[in-house]
Amino acid sequence: MDFNELKNTDKDIYGIIEEEWERQKNGIELIASENFTSKSVMEAMGSFLTNKYAEGYPGKRYYGGCYIVDKAEDLARDRMKKLFNAEHVNVQPHSGSQANMAVYMSVLKPGDTVLGMSLNHGGHLTHGSKVSFSGKLYNFVSYGLNSDTEIIDYDEMRELALKHKPKMIVSGASAYPRKIDFKKIREICDEVGAYMMVDMAHIAGIIAAGRHESPVPYADFVTTTTHKTLRGPRGGAIICKEKYGAALDKTIFPGIQGGPLMHIIAAKAVCFGEALKDEYKEYIDQIIKNAKVFGEELVKYGFRLVSGGTDNHLLLVDLTNKNITGKDLEELLDKVNITVNKNAIPFDKLKPNVTSGIRVGTPAVTTRGFKEEEMKKVAYFINKAVENREGDLSAIKREVIELCEAFPLYE
């Protein structure tokens, strides 16, 4: 990227950007919710479109001069509809959390009962956590995983639904490595007369590529982010049945947002366009292959995987038998240029800011070009760091940097 102007006008921010670039360039990025966008996506985000205010929707704006940016939003909507075979979409949400809020506020009233996946078992803050708006505005009841299989307990979900008669059942997760049975959830929703909402933020790209069953035919509402596996700009989007479209659009604007971010919407259009290409399916296939091999290698080194493995892009690693917390391993790996995040495991006895596990994912390293052999090396680096946690880590760090140099970013 050309930062010549910024370098001259704001050396402080330029310096911070350069520092972050060095970190990304020389580090192995394993945070499951992160990815590296294409240069095309970044160019759209940094374009003249950032200058345009466009409250409202294409053809129905509250500002003049929107006839060009209307084309960008129409293109983003059309591409998203094609990608997910959707009836109605809205590409204006600023984030995944905003998308979830919009769905809730379009069909629920404060105090309504909602069923959502427990944050401690892999759900998301906006699926009913007491510290989130969702848990404060609505009466969320949590379902979780079966303690033996560490798979979603659909029997418990049904029992809770029959008992509490929720207005909505929310599925989708932020730390769940297995496939989700959307058909079964639809059946439970129908049995109790509940709306079905799916937050597919983490697996949207996998669904777009046809490597996970799509929730779109089953759900009333589907929300997503556009980064993560979709590899687009940071933002949100919503799919719904046509009959809910008008109410949903009105909830987003003027309900919870003002002007949309037209430069981000254009970048969303770019990422949807990229995801419609055949090579994107190959990319998603490699993400899944990399995750499986990565998991198998970690198991060889004695790490335990929650549920025993993965069907998607992420792994939840139980560190209990390694006598190290998620917090400590996150900090340890930072020292060797490997980035992970501490994460609670199901039925975790440690605090959320300590945790007994880490969450790792393969979208970013796959974008970088890593394949199965590189993932074996990454597992080796992690195990070596754990074994030498009290010793000199400089040799591991050098090996990590050498691997990154063999797979340069944005070149």
Swiss-Prot record:
Q: Where does (6S)-5,6,7,8-tetrahydrofolate bind?
A: 119, 123-125
List the cofactors. Answer: pyridoxal 5'-phosphate
Q: Which reaction does it catalyse?
A: (6R)-5,10-methylene-5,6,7,8-tetrahydrofolate + glycine + H2O = (6S)-5,6,7,8-tetrahydrofolate + L-serine
Q: Which PROSITE patterns match?
A: SHMT (PS00096)
Q: Name the Pfam families on file.
A: SHMT
**Which keywords, in A-to-Z order, does the entry hold?**
Amino-acid biosynthesis, Cytoplasm, One-carbon metabolism, Pyridoxal phosphate, Transferase
Gene Ontology BP terms:
glycine biosynthetic process from serine; tetrahydrofolate interconversion
Q: Mind telling me what this protein is named? A: Serine hydroxymethyltransferase
